[in-house]
């Protein structure tokens, strides 16, 4: 198994139809002990229970640094180490540039970008002490092509920020044997976009995807598992596109 005896932490992983939970499920199937962090309303303990008794769901808010640190302290007490962090938590909003309010901007940037920084800051001291670890950050094709299917420009900005932050951390912590990489999903079938794309627009999107289908959460999860595992042990600062060819660059 690719992740045998590894301890993995996944933020925003409680949504059963989302990228985070698909990643949690695949990591568990590959031997990792998984800790799912999410807001109380998302019931991370219920999601973790579906993976098996050794997996744990903890309430944490990635926009609150103290909350991230408390969760990591609890994981350290329970598992003794953290080998993998998946910065998956994020939100989107369908806004045009002139319609984005300050509150909109703060909400999206806080979860996707600030949350990635705070969760990484909480985990990094433990990884440094262990002399090793893998951090995988979920960005988006929206960061690369200047807009997505549903997310507004502030979402593109947040996810572009995640790319820059991950690359900078990769450069900073390579000497500690800590790898930091990004995955940039295209359109993936999750609850975020379920029922929100009209049939005519959906067909136009499909016409622009060489592989001819919308992605599934497991498509992204497989790439995250690869970057988290030793199969990619000489990869850091990488951006791995998972978009079916929607953007080839």
Describe each region flagged by the PLM.
Residues 3-35:
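Canonical Rossmann dinucleotide-binding motif of NAD(H)/NADP(H)-dependent dehydrogenases/reductases
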Residues 120, 158, 166:
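Active-site helix of classical SDR
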Residues 225, 236-249:
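Short C-terminal tail/terminal secondary-structure segment
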Residues 125, 167, 171-175, 233:
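Alpha-helical segment proximal to the catalytic Tyr-Lys
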Residues 41-42, 60-71, 102, 218-219:
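The beta1-alpha1 cofactor-binding region of Rossmann-like NAD(H)/NADP(H)-dependent oxidoreductases
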Residues 140:
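Residue(s) in the substrate-gating loop at a strand-loop-helix junction
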Residues 96-97, 104-109, 193, 205:
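Substrate-binding pocket helix/loop in short-chain dehydrogenase/reductase
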């Amino acid at each position: 198994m690719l992740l045998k005896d590894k301890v993995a932490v996944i933020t925003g992983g409680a949504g059963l139809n989302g990228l985070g939970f698909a990643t949690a499920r695949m990591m568990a199937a590959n031997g990792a002990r998984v800790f799912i962090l999410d807001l109380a309303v998302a019931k991370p303990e219920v999601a973790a229970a579906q993976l098996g008794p050794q997996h744990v769901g903890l309430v944490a808010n990635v926009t609150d640094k103290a909350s991230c640190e408390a969760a990591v302290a609890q994981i350290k007490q329970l598992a003794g180490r953290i080998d993998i962090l998946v910065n998956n938590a994020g939100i989107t909003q369908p806004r045009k540039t002139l319609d984005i309010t300050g509150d909109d901007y703060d909400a999206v940037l806080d979860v996707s970008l600030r949350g990635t920084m705070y969760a990484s800051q909480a985990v990094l001291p433990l990884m440094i002490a262990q002399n090793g670890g893998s951090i995988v950050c979920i960005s988006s094709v929206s960061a690369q092509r200047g807009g997505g299917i549903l997310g507004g420009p502030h979402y593109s900005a947040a996810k572009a920020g995640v790319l820059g932050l991950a690359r900078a951390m990769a450069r900073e912590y390579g000497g500690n044997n800590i790898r930091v990489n990004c995955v940039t999903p295209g359109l993936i079938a999750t609850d975020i976009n379920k029922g929100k794309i009209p049939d005519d627009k959906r067909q136009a999107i499909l016409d622009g995807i060489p592989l001819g289908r919308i992605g599934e959460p497991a498509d992204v999860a497989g790439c995250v598992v690869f970057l988290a595992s030793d199969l990619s042990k000489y990869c850091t600062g990488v951006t791995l596109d998972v978009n079916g060819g929607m953007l080839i660059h």
